[in-house]
Amino acid sequence: MLSNTLRSNFLKFYTNRNHTPVASSPVFPYNDPSILFTNAGMNQFKNIFLGKEQTSYTRATTSQKCIRAGGKHNDLENVGHTSRHLTFFEMLGNFSFGDYFKQDAISFAWEVSLSVFNFDPDFIYATVHEKDDEAFALWEKYLPTNRIFRLTDKDNFWSMADTGPCGFCSELLFDRGEKFGKATSPLEDADGERFLEYWNLVFMEFNRTSDGTLLALQKKCVDTGAGLERLVSLLSETDTVFEADVLRHLIAKVENLSEITYSPTESKGSAFRVIADHVRSLSFAITDGLLPGNTERGYVLRKILRRAVNYGKRLGFHRPFLAEIVPSLIETMGEAYPELQAAETQIQEVLTTEEEHFFKTLQRGGNLLHQVLKSSASLSKISGEDAFKLKDTYGLPIDEIALLAKDHNYTVDMDTFRKLEMEAKERSRKNTVKNKNDSDSIFQDVDPTNTSEFVGYDMLSCDTFIEGIVKYNEIASTLEEGEEGAIILRTTPFYAEKGGQVGDSGEIFCESGTFLVSHTTTPKAGLIAHHGKLSQGSLQTTMAVTAQVNQNLRKKIANNHTGCHLLHKALEVSLGEHIRQAGSYVDSQKIRLDFSHNKALSPEELLTIETLVNEKIRENVPVTIREALYSDVMNSSEIKQFFGDKYGDIVRVVSAGFSHELCGGTHARATGDIGYFRITKEHAVSTGIRRIEATTGEDAENIARGQDTDLNEIATIIQSPKDQLLVKLRNVMEEKKDLAKQLANLENQLVQQQVKSLLTSCDKVNETSYLVYHLTEEEGQRIQHYANTLHKEVPAKFISLWVTEKNDRYIVLVRVSDDLVKQGIDAQALLEELLAPYGGRCGGKAVSAQGSSKELPQIEVLNTILRQWISTRLA
């Protein structure tokens, strides 16, 4: 694959020129809620550019995985319809943090263009900012003046935000020839098809103030980005990015599955392009820990998947098919991104599960669309509200809704639709911006020289000094008895909450007073805050104090943290390499571990995992902790690391028997210190994410003892020895099953008899029979049984509506015969319409739906409403 060669040679070029190769960050920034997805190579270096973070290197090079499908940078709707828009792409880049600037950046870019990209220099053009005389002069060393163009802020000025670091930029373009347009220069090429931009060099040299003033930065930086797919297309001389390399390989797989030949210019060509791009985006997102959902990034992923499925229908796919394309992606990109291979099973399972769910939704949406068409007959227009619901809830693309409407000589209220869509986008945008924790905001005003040194790995007590006091609404110098606040120490043995481990508790004291520490946090970089309450006396800044961690709780936390590591490894060994940690929490009482897995764990699997962890505990191997250069361990398949954590140049490698992880937390001295491990709960957190809760040591033993006590009590109640409990319980359950069968038979007979009498009560309108019937509360327990039995007796052209009461609410069930469903009648839509005036809610399918409401009209009124509804809809 040309992309693999280009990527490798680009990184080698800069590595040979003293750039540190930095691995791609995930496709979404864990610690930056200001953007939905990673959309540029500079995202992971943002805090370095802002001066908030230091690194040991001043030069870096990356190939960054990017997604542009939400927020400010959103190419989703363009994908498939243009020659170069993608939701997923790779951005090659080189970066300088106060090292070299324009001269070397331009020199490097020219050399790479010729020696790595192998471009003909006679076809290269450059643009610079109209005020950037320095860049213009530098390009004159390589290009004739008539191939260097000065442009305005709109095209050649870059800024991270309204204020802060910014600067001029310079773009490199390649002339693809007259085949792509008659323009003779980039200035005439409005669409950018002939003179294709392939690299952008950003020179961060200013700091923009709130009044717009540009001040010179003390540390000037360089940030460049070149789209890999665009480079591959240029070198392959293809019309679009889809006709070359990885994307063409994926399109070939779609050709094979659909048995349709791809033609870029035919109408179905867009479907091939959409599917190829979207499968790649989804696969990388799932690999990095994202899952389709209903909010924020998950919502965007679900939109991408549903868009791929809808375009798949144009190629004849009416079943889940996306997972079948994944092996072709791994075949082409698995070597560069081995994490794709490890996550293959999970990617396929997530895609298939989502597709199955969506196909069911589409069936309901299609039925609903036909119903909407019927209900809008008098206006010959689909309302914007209905169109938005069909798109947002049921995933029907607006162009498909419009086409179906046109087939029936209907129009769509697009103005209202677009208004509702904009409102939904605004809600989504607001949801992505996390509000700063009010209780932490005051810490931003703490003197930046008041930093804390953590010494708690080696000691649980130390003599130190109070550097600062915070009372949550103000910076203070004293704390009096009974007051709550936070104390900042010069050195501290207290571990601050991070990496899923709870912060330490304990005491800070001297002769003047005692402060009880309830928890410890890091409200901003370099600052450790000890939160709590002054129990007696008074304390003030500069005082000499003793900081004492609660030793018993620290030991329990450390044991649980090591237990969490063992659990994580046991999950991987027992369930497969697709297991990825999705979150964790450890305190003195429990372990909570979230992990990627698509189904509930069986009792046998849980027992296997628990047994394996306890085996490792009994081995009593030392827990070793060593420091290492992150660059030395970042690509190790043996050492677990998590994208949610920000790693520095030096990292801690924690090894506990078969488990090896990068971790900054506190741990047991040996696995035997944990004592005993017990799983207490396993359940789903969200689609594709499971959670195990567990505990260790005395807490685990207490659970075991409590369960043993319960068994003794059960044995006494059912009058059986403990060793015969299982046999006795099975006998009891068999007896219960027999009794249940007898009861069911009696109930069935009762229902059959009552249904026969109801047949004479059915009414008829427009050749459709219907029944509205009120069941007693006792009969209402079998409401579904009544409906199913009656519809067996009247299998066609029949609608039944049943009402009963439960817990001071009306329970309503609507059942529709299959032939009416095929005509577009939807039980849920009918029930929604019926309950809406009374504030009721419902759920279900086209054939049957059930809901409830606090209010409901008399049964006679319901009969009239249903009769009128049938008269209108089935005229």
Curated annotation (Swiss-Prot):
Annotated binding of Zn(2+), by residue: 561, 565, 663, 667
Molecular functions (GO terms): alanine-tRNA ligase activity; aminoacyl-tRNA deacylase activity; ATP binding; tRNA binding; zinc ion binding
EC number: 6.1.1.7
Catalytic activity: tRNA(Ala) + L-alanine + ATP = L-alanyl-tRNA(Ala) + AMP + diphosphate
Domain description: Consists of three domains; the N-terminal catalytic domain, the editing domain and the C-terminal C-Ala domain. The editing domain removes incorrectly charged amino acids, while the C-Ala domain, along with tRNA(Ala), serves as a bridge to cooperatively bring together the editing and aminoacylation centers thus stimulating deacylation of misacylated tRNAs.
Function per UniProt: Catalyzes the attachment of alanine to tRNA(Ala) in a two-step reaction: alanine is first activated by ATP to form Ala-AMP and then transferred to the acceptor end of tRNA(Ala). Also edits incorrectly charged Ser-tRNA(Ala) and Gly-tRNA(Ala) via its editing domain.
Name of the protein described by the UniProt record: Alanine--tRNA ligase
